C-alpha cells in the first residue's frame, strides 16, 4: 500500500491530503450534497479539466443529484495538457505559430510543441517527469522528500525544521542559514543524489541551499513528539521576488499557480510561508492577490524562530527567477503566442478575486491610458493625445494612475479587466495586460529599447501587442540620465506625434473589433 502511495505521488495521482477530495459520509443529513462543490472556487470553464484529474470527485458528482457540474461529466477527456492520459486535441488550448523561427526549429508543428514546452502546460509536464524520490519512506508514518531536477520544486511529508539556533541578518536568502540536522525527516535518504542537484543553486532559482543539508533523522518528528509546533495544514514555502514591482511579484504568483497544478490541488485551506532569512518585513503592494491562493495571512518564516516546527505536508514552490523558468527568465521561440497556462492563470485569479467583465459596451471601445507619476517615462503631451482620442466617438477614454495609496489593487484589476485597449509606457504597470479580456489589445507606447519584455508577456497571455514603430516621431526630453549607467532611454520622458499615435490606436481598435471573441461585431463599420 505504501509503495502505491509513493508511485501515486510520482504519477501525479495523489493530491495534498484533504485537498479536493470527496468524502461521502454515511451519517450525512438526507438531502445534502455528497461533496462541498462550492469549495472548488474554479471558473466554470476549468471544471471539466479539474474533474479529469480528480475522477473521485467526478464519480461522486455522477451519483449526486445535487451536483451542479453534471453537464461537465460528458467532457472528462478535457485536460490541461500535463496529464499522462492527455491527448493534444483535448488540451486546454494550444499555442498559435504564424511562422517558423529557423534558429530554433524547421516546422510549424515543432515550433508549436516547443513553445508549449517552454511556456505552457508542457512546462508542468516536464517538471512532473523529472520528479524523483530523494528520501524514501519505509512505512506509512515515515517522512518523505521528492523533488524535480535542480530542486526547483519539492514536496515533503513529516518535515522537521529546527529554528532554535539560527542567526538572522540583512540577507533575505542566506545560504548557510540552516546547519546539519536543522532540516530533515525519518526516511531513507539518497544523499549522493540530493547533493548532485546543485548546478542551479541560486536564491530565486532553486531550493538547493535550503535542502542540501536535509538529514536522515533517527526519530519520527511528529509521532515521537519532537516538535514544539505541528503544522497540520498543507504548507507552501515560497521565496519571493520584489513585492513592490508587479512584473516581478507576479512571477511569484504565476509559479505558485503552476505549483498547484503539479500538486493537483487548488485548495485555499493551506498556509503560505515566506522563506526569508532576514529580520525584515516584506513590502507587498499586491497582497490582495494572496486571497486567490490562501484563506490565511502569509506567514514570515521568522514566526517560527526558536522553535522546532514539524509540517505534515510541505511544498517548496517553483521559483520566480528560475533559469528557463516562467516568466522572468523565459527564452521564447519567435512567431508563437497564446498559452493556455497564462490564460488559465488570469481566469483563476480574476474568478477568485471576484473581478467580473461588465462589457463590452454597445457602440463603444473602452480605452485606458496608464499615466505615470514617477520621475521618468512620463508622457509629456498626454493631454494632447487624450484629446485626440476623444475625437473618435466610439472611444470611451479613461486616464488612470495606478498609485496604490489612491487606488487599491482590486480596483485596478476591475479597470484593467474592463478595458478593450490598454495604453502605457514601458514599465511594470503593463503587467496588467495579464488580466485584459481575451479580445483586448495592449499598446506599449514606447518600449525604451527593451523590446522583448512586454511583447513576450503579451505573447504568453495571447493578447494583441503593438508598440511605437517610427523613431522619428517620438521625442525624448533628453538622452536620459541613469545614476550609474549614464545615458539611458528608460530614464527620461517623451512626447509623441499625435497623428502617428492615432494611427496605431486605430490599428489596435481594428484588431479588437475583428477578434473572434468580440461579441459586438456590428460596431466594426461604425468605427
UniProtKB/Swiss-Prot annotation:
It is an enzyme of class 2 (transferase). Residues 1-19 form the signal peptide. GO terms for biological process: protein O-GlcNAcylation via threonine; protein O-linked glycosylation. Its main location: endoplasmic reticulum. It catalyses: L-seryl-[protein] + UDP-N-acetyl-alpha-D-glucosamine = 3-O-(N-acetyl-beta-D-glucosaminyl)-L-seryl-[protein] + UDP + H(+); L-threonyl-[protein] + UDP-N-acetyl-alpha-D-glucosamine = 3-O-(N-acetyl-beta-D-glucosaminyl)-L-threonyl-[protein] + UDP + H(+). A motif (Required for optimal activity) lies at residues 295-297. Its EC number is 2.4.1.255. GO terms for molecular function: protein O-acetylglucosaminyltransferase activity. Keywords: Endoplasmic reticulum, Glycoprotein, Glycosyltransferase, Signal, Transferase. Coiled coil: none annotated. GO terms for cellular component: endoplasmic reticulum lumen. It is found in: Endoplasmic reticulum lumen. InterPro entries: Glyco_transf_61_cat (IPR049625), Glycosyltransferase_61 (IPR007657). Glycans are attached at residue 354. A motif (Prevents secretion from ER) lies at residues 524-527. Pfam families: Glyco_transf_61. Belongs to the glycosyltransferase 61 family. Catalyzes the transfer of a single N-acetylglucosamine from UDP-GlcNAc to a serine or threonine residue in extracellular proteins resulting in their modification with a beta-linked N-acetylglucosamine (O-GlcNAc). Specifically glycosylates the Thr residue located between the fifth and sixth conserved cysteines of folded EGF-like domains. This is EGF domain-specific O-linked N-acetylglucosamine transferase. It comes from Rattus norvegicus (Rat).
